[in-house]
Amino acid sequence: SGPAQKQNVVNQLLVLIYLYKXDS
């Protein structure tokens, strides 16, 4: 539990935003 978990969450959020933007 540390920066690795936070980076994982940020990565997932980035992918979600990317998909959301691309979908529009």
UniProtKB/Swiss-Prot annotation:
Tissue expr: Hemolymph.
Molecular function via GO: oxygen carrier activity
Primary location recorded for the protein, binned into one broad class: secreted
GO cellular component, one term: extracellular region
Cellular localization per UniProt: Secreted, Extracellular space
Superkingdom field: Eukaryota
UniProtKB keywords: Copper, Oxygen transport, Secreted, Transport
Assigned protein family: Belongs to the tyrosinase family. Hemocyanin subfamily.
Protein purpose: Hemocyanins are copper-containing oxygen carriers occurring freely dissolved in the hemolymph of many mollusks and arthropods.
Protein's recorded name: Hemocyanin subunit 4e
Protein's organism: Maja squinado
